[in-house]
């Protein structure tokens, strides 16, 4: 756990708190944890580079470093503001080629596959969406725009599309009747999120913090990221940006058509279309052998995987654990064994005190999503 003893950032180091977060010690503490983890990661990367050097491979290796999304704090990860989209990207070439050079080109994650192939001297296939920005098959043109999308937010659902050039960001909200803030159990565990909710309920949010808690959204948003890096001032209705807004809107429409965007299809229908004749195959029940409280499991369906968990309220086991070897089950506790292959229906066995008490077969994966995840969009 990352408590005070794990902090690697000096308390004397000043912290710049983004204006949409609480301007107090709660957010500062969360940010110190983030920066401490960055320091720890930097040390880990140094160890890997040293290992490559010791093995004589460092100057024969291209190292590409990037994160998987923007910041982890509220109004960052999962959102299409730069705080959620913008990530670090560092490329280390052998023998210090282009060392310490900064590059302001627009790069999208879809550019990574063709670029890595290009770096290896392999021509990217034409079906890849991205542009190679390095290597033998580097694209002759640079990106004018990058694009973003947000749909499912864990247990909450929305539909937002984004277009960004080097300065301006355009957002299209397909569900403007929904609030900006959507409750997510994982995010609610963050102290800064808990503090924002406390401040909201107490009426203590300032104007910048309150923006995220508006109960409906503008259909379109436009931000000047040069003048407004935190994207707090929507200029979509400003007449002087009328032509820019139109160009961004048209680019969003063009991109959605080009990639055959499925966002407007009801999620249940989209999932149903994945399967031949809309029918899902069933993972076969595994072979379960029980000896007193010892449980051994063997898969039957090729390619399927096994997981287990306990359901006792007194000593719960949160989430599934991969089955690797026979389990010594707990007395007077329910052990659940799940067999699942991706794209198939799962089967779950419940075991109590050495006996199988129940076998659960979902009716269809489609109906499961209909109950749990279905949503409609305009």
Predicted feature residues:
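C-terminal cap/loop subdomain of S1 sulfatases and analogous C-terminal strand-loop tails that border
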Residues: 113, 120-221, 274-288
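Short, compositionally stereotyped local motifs that mark structural "simplifiers"
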Residues: 236, 246-250, 258-378
